[in-house]
């Protein structure tokens, strides 16, 4: 067997399929682009769904990739098994309506057994097949020459993820020999069984059926191939490693952790689990942050936070009690740099994010652990088997403990956790967290009509807004028709069109279609599978027919305003990077006639000064009257120019480059102004956070910017008039009013304090004596909880001692407060427990510390009853 590094195995795979006529697709970012069905790219095929369901026709039906992936449905097993990972690489080859079973099987066998490639001993390889897949069995037996003993029928060998393409599959296994299992009585010791001897290395999926919504299966219009080879497994065989973790993908990380911890790997099972957890999780977190995800309490951000905190928990096993994960980022970058330069290129930013997250967790970890230990100890002392949901929620909400982390600690003590109770406390957050356990979701059912419309349609709208063309196709109700009449809607493809199809954030053009016999409006334009512009139209007069010569006219006003916003978006993108840092990546955009919206990745808040700076930069570029140059060039040349690519997009060999002087260079298929002066004016309307690590700027240009400024100016004038000041004097006048208001509030608080003190003389006079304990339970006039606290302060100052409970009516609700002196606490009284009981008598609840608590109620009419109940509670406790 050849001795190969992981980088060499990856490259051999891609070189092999390139030689076989496949286009090598770049690895997509882990954060899905325009696919809301999954949190992460979790397989090689996840980026190919649009080809498999026929919504897009690829330029080359043969494709291959090495795709970084994240799966989080088995986090608890990572580190405890030989091959569970949260981050992994999937090598795959794909055929969309080209070669099928024989081609896929022959390619796989050649790559695995040819001395030119991997060079495995054929006798070491076994395959599994679906029992009813006679075609695959015949190919393995007759074309490849495998004996019956090396072909195993497995009922589960059928790939089906719900509605969409499905079909049988064939898995290839490598026999690692009797060292990894030789018990002939073991019912799982066979290829496809649960054992360490026969290791699955490649899965060949033969997509030949549509799984229809009604549950039936029908043959696909185009049969497809989808294969997946786990790089980590493959490398473990080639490098003769007992588990994936002893390969060159993980060992450099483990060695670095050894240096940090002063503990050796391979000498203690508990320590080794910790090493593996850390090595796996840092790969996931580093790549995910590099691809635009950031730690948070929801969605994919919750997964990152959970992984980081799980790694920190395991680091304690290795006596690492300080932030350290960030130190491993350069190691990950170095291991993967030959194919994935993104981690090494963003090391500083990724380290900053991880270190900040670690420091935050360490601030609360020890306190949280102390509370958890108390909870676990109490549970054991009281013979409880389950940790309460309320306790789990407190650890999560206050100390940032993921419920899974609490569960792992509980399991270590032989206890379970109350998941249902926790979910009742925090249903929304748990729902979002559970959504992270999604796998590849159903694709659309593969359709034929649009995929079979192959006539070319040319977009001529870069240089024209009007054009005479011919109708090629009219589609109504998913069928080709010859004509569409007044009052009806349809989809139309023209031989040439000036109408821009929605893409890259730019909205579709609208406009009119005129022929000798009819008039229609274009309401939307989208891309068809074969890249034609597909126009959704409504016919207003007469009839339109296939073959008609028509005049197409784009709405010039809307187009003009749209392109101003599009070029301004490019300028803003560059200004964001210049102001905030190169880590900023586009996360989405909308370019419409009336505004632009730009979503981007950024860790932290944006200051007013930064927003002002960005706005100034964009306007300076507008006023510099820079020509916008657009040209097509090879992608390699565009990269040499430093062109920015849209994060997550895939590009062909020739790309369209939009250059705004030397300031902004981007790959873009949209329509733009000829000179930045055409934009006129740029104003930022708002800046907000829309999710973990994602922020949004909305802005306007041209007439809309003028309108926005005018509205702001009118608002300022109106405010100045109310203040009886000029617009220049208005800010100073507002500051003075604020100062006056603060002084009035201060004086008011002072008066209220004096009133409370005066009222206290009556309230605190002659407290009730119950078993030697002074008890005061009275209703007072207090507008809010702050005033009630002032009464408590006065009670403490007078050193009356005992128990105090006060209530006040505030509108339709009740405020309650209680206090217990130190000697009463020693006697067993607890302010929080007492007030919790009292509050129930007026429709409320609450609680607090032994010395002080507060509560609310919903029934003011029962306040007197609640206060009378205080004496009863004290007497019951003394009984």
Curated annotation (Swiss-Prot):
Origin superkingdom: Bacteria
Protein keywords: Aminoacyl-tRNA synthetase, ATP-binding, Cytoplasm, Ligase, Metal-binding, Nucleotide-binding, Protein biosynthesis, RNA-binding, tRNA-binding, Zinc
Binding locations of Zn(2+): 566, 570, 668, 672
Cofactor requirement: Zn(2+)
One example GO MF annotation: ATP binding
SMART domains referenced in this protein's UniProt entry, alphabetically: tRNA_SAD
Gene Ontology terms describing biological process: alanyl-tRNA aminoacylation
Pfam families to which the protein is assigned, alphabetical: DHHA1 (PF02272), tRNA-synt_2c (PF01411), tRNA_SAD (PF07973)
Note accompanying the cofactor annotation: Binds 1 zinc ion per subunit.
EC number: 6.1.1.7
PANTHER family: ALANINE--TRNA LIGASE, CYTOPLASMIC, ALANYL-TRNA SYNTHETASE
Family according to the record: Belongs to the class-II aminoacyl-tRNA synthetase family.
Primary role: Catalyzes the attachment of alanine to tRNA(Ala) in a two-step reaction: alanine is first activated by ATP to form Ala-AMP and then transferred to the acceptor end of tRNA(Ala). Also edits incorrectly charged Ser-tRNA(Ala) and Gly-tRNA(Ala) via its editing domain.
Domains (record comment): Consists of three domains; the N-terminal catalytic domain, the editing domain and the C-terminal C-Ala domain. The editing domain removes incorrectly charged amino acids, while the C-Ala domain, along with tRNA(Ala), serves as a bridge to cooperatively bring together the editing and aminoacylation centers thus stimulating deacylation of misacylated tRNAs.
Designated name of the protein: Alanine--tRNA ligase
Species for this entry: Listeria welshimeri serovar 6b (strain ATCC 35897 / DSM 20650 / CCUG 15529 / CIP 8149 / NCTC 11857 / SLCC 5334 / V8)
Organism ancestry: Bacteria, Bacillati, Bacillota, Bacilli, Bacillales
Record gene name: alaS
């Amino acid at each position: 067997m050849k001795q190969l590094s992981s980088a060499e195995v990856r490259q051999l795979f891609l070189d092999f399929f390139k030689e076989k006529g496949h286009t090598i697709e770049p690895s997509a970012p882990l954060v899905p682009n325009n696919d809301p069905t999954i949190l992460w790219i979790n397989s090689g095929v996840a980026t190919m769904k649009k080809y498999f369901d026929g919504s897009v026709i690829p330029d080359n039906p043969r494709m291959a990739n090495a795709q970084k992936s994240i799966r989080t449905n088995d986090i608890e097993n990572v580190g405890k098994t030989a091959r569970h990972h949260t981050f992994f690489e999937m090598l795959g080859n794909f055929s969309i309506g080209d070669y099928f079973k024989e081609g896929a099987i022959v390619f796989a066998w050649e790559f695995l057994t040819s001395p030119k490639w991997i060079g495995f001993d054929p006798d070491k390889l076994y395959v599994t097949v679906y029992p009813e897949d006679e075609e695959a069995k015949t190919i393995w037996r007759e074309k490849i020459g495998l004996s019956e003993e090396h072909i195993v029928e497995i009922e589960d060998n059928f790939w089906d993820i719900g509605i969409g393409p499905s079909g049988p599959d064939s898995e290839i296994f490598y026999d690692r020999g009797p060292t990894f299992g030789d018990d002939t009585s073991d019912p799982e010791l066979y290829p496809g069984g649960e054992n360490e001897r026969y290791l699955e290395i490649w899965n060949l999926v033969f997509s030949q059926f549509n799984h229809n919504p009604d549950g039936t299966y029908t043959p696909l219009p185009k049969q497809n191939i989808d294969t997946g080879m786990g790089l980590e497994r493959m490398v473990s065989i080639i490098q003769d490693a007992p588990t994936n973790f002893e390969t060159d993908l993980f060992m450099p990380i483990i060695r670095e952790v050894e240096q940090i911890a002063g503990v050796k790997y391979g000498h203690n099972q508990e320590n080794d689990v910790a090493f593996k957890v850390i090595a796996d999780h840092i790969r996931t977190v580093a790549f995910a942050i590099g691809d635009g995800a950031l730690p948070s309490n929801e969605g994919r951000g919750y997964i990152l936070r959970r992984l980081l905190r799980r790694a920190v928990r395991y680091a304690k096993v290795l006596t690492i009690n300080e932030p350290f994960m960030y130190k491993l980022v350069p190691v990950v970058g170095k291991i993967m740099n030959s194919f994935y330069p993104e981690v090494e290129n963003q090391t500083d930013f990724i380290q900053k994010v991880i270190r900040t997250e670690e420091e935050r967790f360490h601030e609360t970890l020890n306190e949280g652990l102390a509370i958890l230990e108390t909870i676990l100890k109490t549970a054991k002392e009281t013979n409880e088997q389950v940790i309460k949901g309320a306790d789990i929620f407190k650890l999560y909400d206050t100390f940032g403990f993921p419920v899974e982390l609490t569960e792992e600690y509980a399991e270590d003590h032989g206890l379970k956790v109350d998941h249902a109770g926790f979910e009742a406390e925090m249903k929304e957050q748990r729902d979002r967290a559970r959504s992270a356990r999604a796998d590849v979701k159903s694709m659309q059912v593969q359709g034929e009509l649009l995929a079979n419309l192959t006539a070319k349609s040319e977009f001529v709208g870069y240089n024209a807004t009007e054009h005479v063309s011919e109708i090629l196709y009219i589609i109504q109700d998913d069928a080709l028709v010859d004509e569409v009449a007044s009052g009806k809607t349809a989809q139309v493809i023209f031989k040439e069109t000036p109408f821009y199809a929605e893409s890259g954030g730019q909205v579709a053009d609208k406009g009119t279609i005129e022929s000798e016999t009819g008039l229609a409006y274009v309401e939307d334009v989208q891309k068809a599978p074969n890249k034609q512009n597909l126009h959704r139209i409504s016919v207003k007069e007469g009839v339109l027919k296939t073959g008609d010569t028509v005049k197409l006219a784009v709405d010039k006003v809307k187009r003009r305003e749209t392109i101003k916003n599009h070029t301004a978006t490019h300028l803003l993108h560059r200004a964001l990077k210049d102001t905030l840092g190169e880590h900023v990546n586009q996360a989405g955009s909308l370019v419409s006639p009336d505004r632009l919206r730009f979503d981007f990745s950024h860790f932290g808040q944006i200051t007013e000064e930064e927003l002002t700076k960005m706005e100034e930069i964009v306007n300076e570029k507008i006023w510099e009257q820079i020509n916008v140059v657009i040209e097509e060039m090879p992608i390699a040349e565009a990269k040499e120019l430093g062109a920015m690519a849209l994060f997550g997009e895939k590009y062909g060999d020739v790309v369209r480059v939009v250059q705004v002087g030397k300031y902004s260079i981007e790959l873009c298929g949209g329509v733009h102004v000829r000179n930045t002066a055409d934009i006129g004016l740029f104003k930022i309307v708002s800046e907000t956070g829309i999710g973990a690590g994602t922020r949004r700027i909305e802005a306007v240009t041209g007439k809309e910017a003028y309108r926005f400024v005018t509205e702001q100016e009118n608002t300022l004038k109106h405010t100045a008039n109310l203040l009886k000041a000029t617009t220049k004097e208005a800010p100073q006048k507002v500051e003075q009013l604020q100062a006056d208001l603060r002084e009035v509030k201060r004086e008011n608080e002072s008066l209220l304090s004096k009133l409370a003190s005066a009222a206290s003389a009556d309230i605190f006079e002659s407290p009730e004596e119950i078993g030697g304990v002074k008890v005061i339970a009275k209703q007072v006039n207090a507008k809010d909880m702050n005033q009630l606290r002032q009464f408590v302060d006065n009670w403490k100052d007078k050193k009356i001692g005992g128990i105090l409970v006060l209530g006040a009516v505030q509108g339709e609700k009740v405020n309650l407060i209680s206090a217990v002196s130190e000697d009463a606490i020693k006697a067993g009284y607890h302010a929080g427990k007492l007030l919790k009981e009292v509050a129930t008598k007026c429709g409320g609840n609450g609680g607090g510390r032994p010395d002080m608590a507060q509560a609310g109620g919903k029934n003011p009419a029962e306040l007197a009853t609640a206060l009378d109940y205080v004496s009863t509670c004290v007497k019951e406790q003394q009984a």
